[in-house]
Regions:
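Sensory/regulatory domains in signal-transduction proteins
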Residues: 67, 94-101, 128-129, 136, ...
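Amphipathic, small/basic residue-rich leader segments at the start of a protein or domain
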Residues: 1-90, 100-101, 112-120, 305
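Alpha-helical interface subdomain recognition
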Residues: 1-48, 232-375
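Short Pro/Gly-enriched beta-strand edge/turn motifs at strand-loop
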Residues: 87-94, 175-179
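Flexible, small-/acidic-enriched active-site or ligand-binding loops
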Residues: 173-199
Length: 375
C-alpha cells in the first residue's frame, strides 16, 4: 500500500514539519521586494538544518504564491491570501517530460473558447506531461500551468494559468491524472509529481493576465516584450538558491577548518593539518570563493528592485554558488578523512540534496549562456 511505504512516510513527516514551522510564521506575499528579501534570508539560514524544508517552502511561497503576485492581477488576490494561510497549497508546473530549459517549445496547450469564456488545458503527448512538479504528487490543490495559448488556429506562445488539481478531499479533479515521480537521489521528503491534463476546462479568469489578456471581442492583447518580462519576474527565485548554496559551503569549510586545526599528523612533533601547504592549497581557494560569493549575493539582494540586472545577478549567484558548494562539500569531505564520511558530518546528506540545484530553476550550463546577452 502506497500510504505505508517509507517514501510516503518521509513526505508526511516533512509536510508536518512544514505546517508546524509555518504555524509560527506570518509571511505576507506582496509586490514589493521587502518581504521577499526577508524570506530568502530566512531560507539561507534554514539550509543549514533542512534543505527539504526550504524547497517545500519555496514551492509554496516563491514558485506558487509570488508567481501569482507578479504575473496576476487584482482578481487573483484571493489566491494569495489563501496561500499565506495555507488554505491553498500550490505548485509550479512548467517542466515537462520532453522540455525543461526550452520553455518556448512546451507542448501543453490552452485552447480558448470565446463563446464560453473558457480555456481547455491539455497535455496531448507523453512528452508534454508536466514532470518533477514539487508538491504536486500528494499535497498541491492548485498548479500554475505554463501552456501554449491557442485562439483558433493561432498560437500566441507560453502563458501561465491557474488549474485546480484536487478538491477539498484531496481527490483529483475531473480529467486530471497525477502520478508520483518516485525515489530521487535526494530531497525525498519533497513530493515530486507527474501531472496529466485531459482537456481540463478552466474559466477565463484563471489566466494570469498581467502582461497579456483577451479582450471582449476575443482579440489577444499583450504588452511589448511580454515573455521576457514574465521570465524576469520569475528569475529572482534563483537568488535564494545561490544564498542557500553558499551558506552550505561556509558550514562545510567551518567544520573542516576546525578539524584541520585540531587534527595533527606526521613528524617527530606532529603538526596540524592546516599547517601543511598542500592542505591549504586544497581548502583556502574554496574559502576565498565563499567570501566572494557572499559579497556578490549581498550586492544582488540590495539591487533586487532593478529588474534590468536582477535576472543576470540571479543567474550568476545560482550557477557560481551551487557549483562551488558541490566542489566544497566534496573537498571538505575528503579533507576530514574518514570522519567526513560519517553521517553526522552532514556532508553527504547536504551534497545529495544540493546536487539538483545545478539543474532545477534552469540548467547551469544553459543559464550561463544567457549572460552573453547582458549589455
Amino acid at each position: 500500500d502506497y500510504h505505508h511505504r517509507p517514501l510516503y512516510i518521509q513526505r508526511v513527516k516533512l509536510h508536518e514539519k512544514f505546517l508546524l514551522f509555518l504555524s509560527k510564521l506570518s509571511y505576507k506575499i506582496d509586490y514589493s521586494n521587502k518581504n521577499y528579501k526577508l524570506l530568502i534570508k530566512m531560507f539561507e539560514i534554514i539550509h543549514l538544518f533542512d534543505i527539504e524544508l526550504v524547497v517545500k517552502m519555496a514551492v509554496q511561497f516563491n514558485l506558487w504564491g509570488e508567481t501569482i503576485c507578479k504575473l496576476g492581477t487584482e482578481k487573483h488576490s484571493e489566491y494569495i491570501k489563501k496561500t499565506e494561510t495555507l488554505e491553498i497549497l500550490g505548485c509550479f508546473a512548467m517542466t515537462e517530460i520532453g522540455h525543461g530549459s526550452n520553455i518556448f517549445k512546451l507542448e501543453t496547450t490552452a485552447t480558448y473558447n470565446h463563446s464560453r469564456q473558457e480555456f481547455i488545458i491539455n497535455t496531448p503527448y507523453y512528452s508534454s506531461h508536466k514532470y518533477w512538479i514539487g508538491q504536486g504528487a500528494i499535497y498541491a490543490h492548485y498548479a500554475i500551468v505554463f501552456a501554449q495559448l491557442y485562439i483558433g488556429s493561432i498560437c500566441y506562445g507560453v502563458h501561465p494559468f491557474i488549474v485546480q488539481l484536487r478538491n477539498e478531499n484531496k481527490e483529483c479533479m475531473k480529467n486530471v491524472i497525477i502520478k508520483d515521480c518516485g525515489m530521487k537521489n535526494g530531497l525525498n521528503g519533497v513530493d515530486n509529481g507527474e501531472i496529466i491534463f485531459d482537456n481540463v476546462i478552466i474559466p477565463y479568469n484563471n489566466l494570469l493576465d498581467k502582461f497579456a489578456h483577451i479582450d471582449d471581442t476575443g482579440k489577444y492583447v499583450a504588452v511589448k516584450g511580454r515573455l521576457s518580462k514574465m521570465l524576469s519576474e520569475l528569475s529572482k527565485n534563483r537568488l535564494g538558491m545561490g544564498l542557500g548554496s553558499n551558506i552550505v559551503s561556509r558550514y562545510a569549510l567551518k567544520e573542516t577548518l576546525t578539524y584541520a586545526i585540531k587534527r595533527k599528523q606526521f613528524g617527530k612533533i606532529e603538526r596540524s593539518l592546516l599547517s601543511y601547504k598542500s592542505y591549504q592549497h586544497r581548502i583556502m581557494p574554496l574559502l576565498a570563493k565563499s567570501y566572494v560569493n557572499n559579497l556578490f549575493n549581498e550586492h544582488a539582494i540590495n539591487h533586487l528592485d532593478d529588474m534590468s540586472i536582477t535576472h543576470f545577478n540571479s543567474i550568476i549567484s545560482k550557477t557560481a554558488c551551487s557549483w562551488n558548494a558541490l566542489d566544497t562539500l566534496q573537498e571538505c569531505r575528503e579533507g576530514c578523512g574518514g570522519h567526513g564520511y560519517h553521517y553526522k558530518s552532514y556532508f553527504g546528506k547536504m551534497y545529495k540534496n544540493l546536487d539538483i540545484y545545478t539543474t532545477f530553476e534552469g540548467d547551469n550550463n544553459v543559464l550561463l549562456q544567457q549572460i552573453m546577452q547582458f549589455k
